[in-house]
Regions:
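Membrane-interface micro-motifs in multi-pass membrane enzymes
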Residues: 45, 49, 63-67, 115-164
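Membrane-interface coil-to-helix junctions
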Residues: 33-77, 81-86
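Internal/C-terminal transmembrane anchor helices
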Residues: 179-203
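N-terminal membrane topogenic signal
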Residues: 12-28, 110-112
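Membrane-interfacial, low-structure loops and terminal tails that flank and connect transmembrane helices
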Residues: 2-18, 164-182
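Transmembrane-helix motifs of polytopic, lipid-linked glycan transferases
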Residues: 92-110, 125-126, 154-159
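Aromatic-anchored segments of alpha-helical transmembrane domains
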Residues: 32-36, 119-131, 170, 177, ...
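Soluble catalytic regions of membrane-associated enzymes that act on cell-envelope
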Residues: 201-355
Protein backbone atom coordinates (compact mmCIF):
# COMPACT_ATOMS: atom_id res chain seq x y z
CA UNK A 1 0.00 0.00 0.00
CA UNK A 2 1.43 3.31 -1.11
CA UNK A 3 1.63 6.03 1.43
CA UNK A 4 1.18 9.61 0.39
CA UNK A 5 4.35 11.44 1.21
CA UNK A 6 4.10 14.81 2.89
CA UNK A 7 5.89 17.52 0.98
CA UNK A 8 9.06 18.81 2.53
CA UNK A 9 9.09 22.25 4.19
CA UNK A 10 11.25 23.51 1.32
CA UNK A 11 8.67 22.42 -1.27
CA UNK A 12 5.80 23.95 0.71
CA UNK A 13 7.66 27.25 0.97
CA UNK A 14 8.47 27.18 -2.73
CA UNK A 15 4.81 26.64 -3.67
CA UNK A 16 3.62 29.45 -1.38
CA UNK A 17 6.17 31.89 -2.79
CA UNK A 18 5.40 30.88 -6.37
CA UNK A 19 1.67 31.38 -5.85
CA UNK A 20 2.15 34.82 -4.28
CA UNK A 21 0.67 37.54 -6.55
CA UNK A 22 2.78 39.94 -8.54
CA UNK A 23 4.24 42.88 -6.61
CA UNK A 24 2.58 45.25 -9.09
CA UNK A 25 -0.80 44.12 -7.76
CA UNK A 26 0.26 44.98 -4.23
CA UNK A 27 1.49 48.37 -5.42
CA UNK A 28 -1.70 49.16 -7.36
CA UNK A 29 -4.22 48.17 -4.68
CA UNK A 30 -2.08 49.50 -1.82
CA UNK A 31 -1.76 52.97 -3.30
CA UNK A 32 -5.36 52.97 -4.48
CA UNK A 33 -6.19 52.79 -0.76
CA UNK A 34 -3.48 55.36 0.05
CA UNK A 35 -4.73 57.99 -2.43
CA UNK A 36 -8.40 57.06 -2.26
CA UNK A 37 -8.84 56.67 1.50
CA UNK A 38 -5.84 57.81 3.55
CA UNK A 39 -4.96 60.90 1.48
CA UNK A 40 -8.30 61.25 -0.29
CA UNK A 41 -9.51 64.35 1.60
CA UNK A 42 -6.32 66.24 0.71
CA UNK A 43 -6.59 65.39 -2.97
CA UNK A 44 -10.29 66.29 -2.97
CA UNK A 45 -9.39 69.77 -1.69
CA UNK A 46 -6.68 69.92 -4.39
CA UNK A 47 -9.43 69.27 -6.94
CA UNK A 48 -11.50 72.05 -5.37
CA UNK A 49 -8.56 74.44 -5.82
CA UNK A 50 -8.19 73.42 -9.48
CA UNK A 51 -10.16 75.31 -12.14
CA UNK A 52 -11.09 73.24 -15.18
CA UNK A 53 -13.93 74.50 -17.34
CA UNK A 54 -15.58 73.14 -20.47
CA UNK A 55 -16.62 76.64 -21.56
CA UNK A 56 -15.06 77.83 -24.81
CA UNK A 57 -12.08 80.06 -24.16
CA UNK A 58 -12.11 79.60 -20.38
CA UNK A 59 -8.78 77.75 -20.38
CA UNK A 60 -7.11 79.93 -23.02
CA UNK A 61 -5.00 81.99 -20.54
CA UNK A 62 -3.49 78.77 -19.21
CA UNK A 63 -3.10 77.30 -22.70
CA UNK A 64 -0.94 80.27 -23.73
CA UNK A 65 1.55 79.78 -20.87
CA UNK A 66 4.61 77.51 -20.90
CA UNK A 67 3.51 73.85 -20.70
CA UNK A 68 -0.07 75.13 -20.62
CA UNK A 69 -1.48 72.18 -22.57
CA UNK A 70 0.14 69.75 -20.12
CA UNK A 71 -1.25 71.61 -17.11
CA UNK A 72 -4.73 71.56 -18.68
CA UNK A 73 -4.48 67.77 -19.04
CA UNK A 74 -3.32 67.58 -15.42
CA UNK A 75 -6.25 69.67 -14.22
CA UNK A 76 -8.66 67.53 -16.24
CA UNK A 77 -7.27 64.34 -14.68
CA UNK A 78 -7.40 65.91 -11.21
CA UNK A 79 -11.18 66.30 -11.55
CA UNK A 80 -11.42 62.55 -10.89
CA UNK A 81 -10.64 63.33 -7.24
CA UNK A 82 -14.09 64.85 -6.82
CA UNK A 83 -14.62 61.19 -5.90
CA UNK A 84 -11.40 60.19 -4.09
CA UNK A 85 -12.22 56.51 -4.61
CA UNK A 86 -12.03 56.81 -8.41
CA UNK A 87 -9.33 59.46 -8.33
CA UNK A 88 -7.19 57.14 -6.22
CA UNK A 89 -7.70 54.35 -8.76
CA UNK A 90 -6.65 56.68 -11.59
CA UNK A 91 -3.49 57.96 -9.90
CA UNK A 92 -2.48 54.54 -8.58
CA UNK A 93 -3.02 53.12 -12.07
CA UNK A 94 -0.78 55.79 -13.60
CA UNK A 95 2.00 55.10 -11.09
CA UNK A 96 1.63 51.35 -11.61
CA UNK A 97 2.05 51.80 -15.37
CA UNK A 98 5.07 54.05 -14.78
CA UNK A 99 6.67 51.33 -12.63
CA UNK A 100 5.84 48.60 -15.14
CA UNK A 101 7.26 50.53 -18.10
CA UNK A 102 10.33 51.66 -16.10
CA UNK A 103 11.19 48.02 -15.49
CA UNK A 104 10.94 47.26 -19.19
CA UNK A 105 12.71 50.33 -20.58
CA UNK A 106 15.60 50.31 -18.09
CA UNK A 107 15.89 46.47 -17.94
CA UNK A 108 15.17 46.38 -14.21
CA UNK A 109 14.42 42.71 -13.75
CA UNK A 110 15.34 39.79 -11.55
CA UNK A 111 17.02 40.84 -8.34
CA UNK A 112 16.99 44.50 -9.45
CA UNK A 113 13.27 44.47 -10.29
CA UNK A 114 12.30 46.39 -7.16
CA UNK A 115 14.16 49.46 -8.46
CA UNK A 116 11.43 50.11 -11.03
CA UNK A 117 9.22 51.48 -8.24
CA UNK A 118 11.64 54.29 -7.37
CA UNK A 119 10.15 56.93 -9.78
CA UNK A 120 6.66 56.33 -8.38
CA UNK A 121 7.86 56.59 -4.79
CA UNK A 122 9.75 59.81 -5.55
CA UNK A 123 6.43 61.28 -6.71
CA UNK A 124 4.58 59.98 -3.62
CA UNK A 125 7.17 61.39 -1.21
CA UNK A 126 7.20 64.76 -2.99
CA UNK A 127 3.40 64.99 -2.70
CA UNK A 128 3.42 64.11 1.01
CA UNK A 129 6.37 66.41 1.77
CA UNK A 130 4.77 69.46 0.13
CA UNK A 131 1.41 69.02 1.89
CA UNK A 132 -0.73 72.13 1.28
CA UNK A 133 1.76 73.35 -1.32
CA UNK A 134 0.53 70.83 -3.91
CA UNK A 135 -2.49 73.10 -4.46
CA UNK A 136 -2.18 76.34 -2.45
CA UNK A 137 -1.21 79.26 -4.74
CA UNK A 138 0.43 76.92 -7.24
CA UNK A 139 -0.36 75.34 -10.59
CA UNK A 140 -2.60 72.42 -9.66
CA UNK A 141 -2.18 70.86 -13.11
CA UNK A 142 1.34 69.80 -12.14
CA UNK A 143 0.00 67.27 -9.64
CA UNK A 144 -1.22 64.82 -12.30
CA UNK A 145 0.26 66.51 -15.36
CA UNK A 146 3.83 65.55 -14.44
CA UNK A 147 3.13 61.81 -13.93
CA UNK A 148 1.05 61.86 -17.14
CA UNK A 149 4.03 63.32 -19.03
CA UNK A 150 6.41 60.73 -17.52
CA UNK A 151 3.99 57.95 -18.45
CA UNK A 152 3.74 59.22 -22.03
CA UNK A 153 7.54 59.42 -22.39
CA UNK A 154 8.00 55.90 -21.00
CA UNK A 155 5.32 54.55 -23.34
CA UNK A 156 7.13 56.05 -26.34
CA UNK A 157 10.45 54.64 -25.11
CA UNK A 158 8.86 51.21 -24.64
CA UNK A 159 7.58 51.24 -28.22
CA UNK A 160 11.05 52.20 -29.44
CA UNK A 161 12.76 49.47 -27.38
CA UNK A 162 10.24 46.86 -28.53
CA UNK A 163 10.77 47.87 -32.17
CA UNK A 164 14.52 47.25 -32.05
CA UNK A 165 14.70 44.48 -29.47
CA UNK A 166 13.52 40.91 -29.18
CA UNK A 167 12.68 41.44 -25.53
CA UNK A 168 8.94 41.12 -25.05
CA UNK A 169 6.95 43.21 -22.61
CA UNK A 170 5.58 41.00 -19.85
CA UNK A 171 1.92 41.14 -18.85
CA UNK A 172 1.02 44.00 -16.53
CA UNK A 173 0.05 41.75 -13.62
CA UNK A 174 2.04 38.68 -14.72
CA UNK A 175 5.51 38.33 -13.20
CA UNK A 176 8.13 37.82 -15.93
CA UNK A 177 9.28 34.23 -16.36
CA UNK A 178 12.85 35.21 -15.48
CA UNK A 179 11.78 36.59 -12.07
CA UNK A 180 12.30 34.24 -9.15
CA UNK A 181 9.66 34.16 -6.40
CA UNK A 182 12.29 35.64 -4.10
CA UNK A 183 12.53 38.66 -6.41
CA UNK A 184 8.80 39.29 -6.03
CA UNK A 185 9.04 38.99 -2.25
CA UNK A 186 11.90 41.47 -2.25
CA UNK A 187 9.87 43.92 -4.36
CA UNK A 188 6.88 43.56 -2.02
CA UNK A 189 9.04 44.25 0.99
CA UNK A 190 10.43 47.33 -0.75
CA UNK A 191 6.88 48.56 -1.49
CA UNK A 192 5.68 47.97 2.07
CA UNK A 193 8.69 49.66 3.67
CA UNK A 194 8.59 52.76 1.48
CA UNK A 195 4.79 52.91 1.68
CA UNK A 196 4.98 52.85 5.47
CA UNK A 197 7.67 55.53 5.23
CA UNK A 198 5.31 57.80 3.25
CA UNK A 199 2.61 57.40 5.92
CA UNK A 200 5.20 58.00 8.65
CA UNK A 201 6.47 61.15 6.96
CA UNK A 202 2.95 62.53 6.78
CA UNK A 203 2.12 61.68 10.41
CA UNK A 204 5.38 63.10 11.77
CA UNK A 205 6.18 65.99 9.43
CA UNK A 206 2.73 67.09 8.17
CA UNK A 207 0.23 65.85 10.79
CA UNK A 208 -2.06 68.86 10.24
CA UNK A 209 -2.63 68.38 6.49
CA UNK A 210 -5.18 65.53 6.50
CA UNK A 211 -7.35 66.79 9.41
CA UNK A 212 -7.38 70.33 7.99
CA UNK A 213 -8.47 69.07 4.57
CA UNK A 214 -11.16 66.89 6.11
CA UNK A 215 -12.55 69.77 8.16
CA UNK A 216 -12.27 72.13 5.20
CA UNK A 217 -14.77 69.88 3.44
CA UNK A 218 -17.09 70.33 6.47
CA UNK A 219 -17.28 66.58 7.12
CA UNK A 220 -17.20 65.74 10.81
CA UNK A 221 -15.36 68.91 11.77
CA UNK A 222 -15.58 68.56 15.54
CA UNK A 223 -14.91 64.83 15.58
CA UNK A 224 -11.85 65.32 13.38
CA UNK A 225 -10.56 68.17 15.52
CA UNK A 226 -10.98 66.16 18.73
CA UNK A 227 -8.62 63.52 17.31
CA UNK A 228 -6.09 66.06 16.01
CA UNK A 229 -3.44 68.35 17.45
CA UNK A 230 -5.10 71.73 18.04
CA UNK A 231 -1.73 73.43 18.51
CA UNK A 232 -1.54 73.68 14.71
CA UNK A 233 -3.18 76.90 13.54
CA UNK A 234 -5.18 75.47 10.62
CA UNK A 235 -6.67 72.65 12.70
CA UNK A 236 -7.59 75.00 15.56
CA UNK A 237 -9.08 77.52 13.13
CA UNK A 238 -11.40 75.04 11.45
CA UNK A 239 -12.43 73.71 14.83
CA UNK A 240 -13.39 77.27 15.80
CA UNK A 241 -15.21 77.65 12.48
CA UNK A 242 -17.21 74.48 13.13
CA UNK A 243 -18.32 75.83 16.52
CA UNK A 244 -19.34 79.17 15.07
CA UNK A 245 -21.30 77.42 12.30
CA UNK A 246 -23.10 75.03 14.66
CA UNK A 247 -23.59 77.06 17.85
CA UNK A 248 -25.09 80.53 17.68
CA UNK A 249 -23.96 81.44 21.18
CA UNK A 250 -20.27 81.12 20.35
CA UNK A 251 -18.74 84.61 20.04
CA UNK A 252 -17.55 85.68 16.58
CA UNK A 253 -13.90 86.52 17.16
CA UNK A 254 -12.57 89.30 14.88
CA UNK A 255 -9.57 88.56 12.69
CA UNK A 256 -7.17 90.78 14.62
CA UNK A 257 -8.00 88.91 17.85
CA UNK A 258 -7.13 85.47 16.50
CA UNK A 259 -4.34 83.85 18.51
CA UNK A 260 -1.04 83.40 16.68
CA UNK A 261 -0.18 80.00 15.24
CA UNK A 262 1.55 78.10 18.03
CA UNK A 263 3.30 75.59 15.75
CA UNK A 264 4.72 76.25 12.29
CA UNK A 265 2.83 75.22 9.16
CA UNK A 266 4.69 74.31 5.95
CA UNK A 267 2.99 76.72 3.54
CA UNK A 268 4.33 78.86 0.70
CA UNK A 269 2.81 81.50 -1.53
CA UNK A 270 3.01 81.77 -5.31
CA UNK A 271 6.44 83.43 -5.09
CA UNK A 272 7.87 80.55 -3.07
CA UNK A 273 8.07 82.53 0.17
CA UNK A 274 6.81 81.22 3.50
CA UNK A 275 3.16 82.13 3.99
CA UNK A 276 1.37 83.00 7.21
CA UNK A 277 -0.85 79.99 7.97
CA UNK A 278 -3.66 82.42 8.80
CA UNK A 279 -4.03 83.25 5.10
CA UNK A 280 -4.97 79.64 4.38
CA UNK A 281 -8.22 79.74 6.37
CA UNK A 282 -8.95 83.46 6.58
CA UNK A 283 -11.81 83.60 4.06
CA UNK A 284 -13.60 80.61 5.60
CA UNK A 285 -13.10 82.14 9.05
CA UNK A 286 -14.59 85.48 7.99
CA UNK A 287 -17.62 83.73 6.49
CA UNK A 288 -18.22 81.71 9.66
CA UNK A 289 -17.78 84.77 11.89
CA UNK A 290 -20.13 86.78 9.64
CA UNK A 291 -17.45 89.32 8.71
CA UNK A 292 -18.77 89.31 5.16
CA UNK A 293 -17.33 92.63 3.91
CA UNK A 294 -13.83 91.47 4.84
CA UNK A 295 -14.48 88.04 3.34
CA UNK A 296 -15.67 89.74 0.14
CA UNK A 297 -12.48 91.80 -0.18
CA UNK A 298 -10.35 88.73 0.49
CA UNK A 299 -12.24 86.72 -2.12
CA UNK A 300 -12.00 89.44 -4.77
CA UNK A 301 -8.26 89.80 -4.15
CA UNK A 302 -7.84 86.03 -4.43
CA UNK A 303 -9.78 85.97 -7.72
CA UNK A 304 -7.57 88.70 -9.16
CA UNK A 305 -4.31 87.18 -7.95
CA UNK A 306 -4.81 83.43 -8.31
CA UNK A 307 -7.81 83.15 -10.60
CA UNK A 308 -11.03 81.21 -10.02
CA UNK A 309 -11.38 77.77 -8.49
CA UNK A 310 -14.45 75.72 -7.53
CA UNK A 311 -13.77 76.37 -3.84
CA UNK A 312 -13.32 80.13 -4.25
CA UNK A 313 -16.35 80.50 -6.52
CA UNK A 314 -18.55 78.70 -3.99
CA UNK A 315 -17.19 80.92 -1.21
CA UNK A 316 -18.00 84.00 -3.29
CA UNK A 317 -21.56 82.80 -3.92
CA UNK A 318 -22.15 82.47 -0.17
CA UNK A 319 -20.55 85.84 0.54
CA UNK A 320 -22.45 87.68 -2.20
CA UNK A 321 -25.77 86.24 -1.07
CA UNK A 322 -25.05 87.34 2.51
CA UNK A 323 -24.27 90.87 1.23
CA UNK A 324 -27.36 90.85 -1.03
CA UNK A 325 -25.18 91.08 -4.15
CA UNK A 326 -27.42 88.66 -6.03
CA UNK A 327 -26.38 89.67 -9.52
CA UNK A 328 -22.75 88.94 -8.70
CA UNK A 329 -23.76 85.67 -7.03
CA UNK A 330 -25.56 84.64 -10.24
CA UNK A 331 -22.42 85.50 -12.21
CA UNK A 332 -20.33 83.13 -10.08
CA UNK A 333 -23.02 80.44 -10.32
CA UNK A 334 -22.92 80.73 -14.11
CA UNK A 335 -19.18 80.01 -14.05
CA UNK A 336 -19.78 77.06 -11.74
CA UNK A 337 -22.24 75.65 -14.29
CA UNK A 338 -19.33 75.20 -16.71
CA UNK A 339 -17.41 73.08 -14.20
CA UNK A 340 -17.93 69.34 -13.74
CA UNK A 341 -19.47 67.93 -10.55
CA UNK A 342 -20.89 71.16 -9.06
CA UNK A 343 -24.56 70.46 -9.78
CA UNK A 344 -25.54 69.90 -6.12
CA UNK A 345 -24.13 73.25 -4.98
CA UNK A 346 -25.83 75.07 -7.85
CA UNK A 347 -29.20 73.49 -7.09
CA UNK A 348 -28.84 74.51 -3.43
CA UNK A 349 -27.98 78.19 -3.96
CA UNK A 350 -29.47 79.09 -7.35
CA UNK A 351 -33.03 79.58 -6.01
CA UNK A 352 -31.79 82.05 -3.38
CA UNK A 353 -29.85 83.98 -6.01
CA UNK A 354 -32.97 84.32 -8.17
CA UNK A 355 -35.26 85.73 -5.46
Amino acid sequence: MNRQQNPSPENRTSRVMTAWPDALKLFFFGFWMFFGIYYGDVLYIAQQYSFFSTAQGAMRPLWETSYGSLWIIGRALLQAFHSPFWGGALLSGMLTLISWLSGYVFRLRGRFGYLKYIPAFVFIYVVVYHGFDIYYQTETGKLLGIPFCILLILACQAVFVRSFSRKKLSGLFTPPAYNRPLDEWKAMGFILILGAGAVGMNEWQRPYVRPTARMQDWKGMKATASRSDLTYGTVAAYYAISRMEDENDVPKVPIDMLPPTSRPIYLHNRDGNLENARNYFLTDYCIASEQYPIAYELGKADLNTNGPSPLLLKQMVRICLALHKKEEARSHLNVLRTLPFEKDFIETYAPEAQE
